[in-house]
Structure formats: C-alpha cells, structure tokens
Amino acid sequence: MLKFRQAEEKDIELILAFIYELAEYEKMLDEVSATPAILKEWLFDKKAAEVIFVMEDDIETGYALFFHNFSTFTGKAGLYLEDIYVKPTYRKKGYGKALFKELVKIAYQRGCSRMEWVCLDWNKPSIDFYLSVKAKPIKDWTIFRLDHEEIKDLANS
C-alpha cells in the first residue's frame, strides 16, 4: 500500500539524492548546485518550499517539491510543482499518478485556485500524463528567468 509523508530535516541527503536523479533523467546534471546546507536553509529554516515522499513498504520511491505562488486575478494562492520524480524501478505502477493526486489534494485542502508547473518539451510520457488529468498547456505565455548572476548584476547596476 502506498503512503505519503512530509519530508523532515533528517531527509536532506535523500532529497538531494532525488534531485540528482531527476537532474540526470532531465539531462541537466551540470546545473545542480544545491547542497545539504542550502536545502536546510531554504526548505526547513525559511520554509520556502515543501517536499513529500511517496512510499512503498517504508521505502521512499519518489518525491515532489512544491511551494505556493499567488494569482492576483483570483486573489488566492496557487500550488507550484517544481519537481515530481519516481525512481525508475517503481515507474509504470501508478506511483507518479498517486503522488500527483496527493498534491492535488493538498492544493484543494489549502484552497488553492490553481496548480502550475513546467515540463520539458521532449518529455512525452509526462506531457501525455498531464493531458490525461485534464491539465492544459498555457498558450500565449513565455517563461522568463534571471539566474543568480543576472540578478546580482541587475541589482548592483
């Protein structure tokens, strides 16, 4: 039977291991700069995001990292899904769907007006899954990002 649990500070190394596995799957391993100290600060000291695990027989088989954003149009918080990942040996068993549904329940219980996330355009299995749960791609929007160096440069200009 699948269970879910909220991550605790003692899980930092496990969270980081999942982050590395996801980054490897997404072919973005060279972009990971998170460390245990950084995760402790942002996840547990500042509480900027949350992590839940999906578990089988007390073994963490996957994780999701999420946080709240805000919609000025609805006047309510939303749930932003940063990461969702299931270990390869546990895929095709419904664990990812169960983990996603648990996030939907959290969003509903907290009164969120929406859930949002991004998905790599080559990740067809994930895109197909999201479409199957009636998620819609956002048309007419482009995602922008300032990385740390750009933030620093602009802040100091």
Describe the residue ranges of each PLM region.
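Conserved active-site alpha-helix within GNAT-family acetyltransferase domains
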Residues: 97, 121-140
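Conserved acetyl-CoA pyrophosphate-binding loop and the N-cap/start of the following alpha-helix
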Residues: 90, 94-102
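Conserved acetyl-CoA binding element of GNAT-fold acetyltransferases
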Residues: 77-88
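Conserved beta-strand-loop-alpha-helix junction that forms the acyl-donor binding cleft
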Residues: 117-126, 145-148
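Conserved N-terminal entry element of GNAT/NAT acetyltransferase domains
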Residues: 1-10, 152-157
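Acetyl-CoA-dependent GNAT
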Residues: 6-10, 17-76, 100, 138
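Active-site acidic-Proline motif in GNAT/NAT acetyltransferases
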Residues: 87-89, 93, 121-122
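Conserved GNAT acetyl-CoA-binding A-motif
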Residues: 108-118
